Amino acid sequence: MRALGIDPGTATMGWGVVERDGGVLRLVDVGALTTPAGMPQPERLLQLYNGLRAIIERLQPDTAAVEELFFGKNVNTALTVGQARGVALLALAQAGIPVYEYKPTAVKQAVAGYGGADKRQMQEMVRLTLGLATVPRPDDAADALAIAICHAYTAPTLQRFGVS
C-alpha cells in the first residue's frame, strides 16, 4: 500500500508518501507545496491544486489521508486551512484515490503512542519509524508523513471491518 499524507495549509501544504510492505514502512518521498505571501487566495489555491495533482501523477498513491480541521481560536486561519483541505480533497477525488481523515489526536496516538504528544516528539517518532537520519523539513512535511504513517497503521483494520 502506498499512502499519501497531507497536512493542509495555504502558505505551506505538507505532503509525504510512505509505502507499507507487510509490517515494514518506508519513505517514498516527502515535501511541501508553498505559495508566496501576498498572492491572491484563488491563485494560491490553484497553485496548491496543480502542485498536488503533479505529486499524485508522479507518485501514484493507492490511498490518501488528510488531517481533519482543528478549530482553534483564529477563525480566519481555520477558514483558509479549510479551503486548502477542500483543494486537496478535490484533487484526490478527481484522481479516484480513496481519502481517509484523521483527527490530530488520532495521528499522535498512532505514531507516538500518546494523543497528547508534542511536535518534537512526533517528529522524532516519524524519523525513527521511517529510519531517517534527520527529521524531514519543513515541519509541515514531517506532519504529513505522520498522517501517512497513521493511515498505514490504521488501514488494515479499516479494511478488515469494511470501512471505506
UniProtKB/Swiss-Prot annotation:
Swiss-Prot/TrEMBL GO biological process terms: DNA recombination; DNA repair
A Gene Ontology cellular-component term: cytoplasm
Key words, A-Z: Cytoplasm, DNA damage, DNA recombination, DNA repair, DNA-binding, Endonuclease, Hydrolase, Magnesium, Metal-binding, Nuclease
Annotated Mg(2+) 1 binding sites: D7, D140
Main location (coarse class): cytoplasm
Cited InterPro entries: RNaseH-like_sf (IPR012337), RNaseH_sf (IPR036397), X-over_junc_endoDNase_Mg_BS (IPR020563), X-over_junc_endoDNase_RuvC (IPR002176)
SUPFAM superfamilies, A to Z: Ribonuclease H-like
Matches recorded under PANTHER family: CROSSOVER JUNCTION ENDODEOXYRIBONUCLEASE RUVC
The name this protein goes by in its record: Crossover junction endodeoxyribonuclease RuvC
Species of the source: Chloroflexus aggregans (strain MD-66 / DSM 9485)
Organism classification: Bacteria, Bacillati, Chloroflexota, Chloroflexia, Chloroflexales
Gene: ruvC
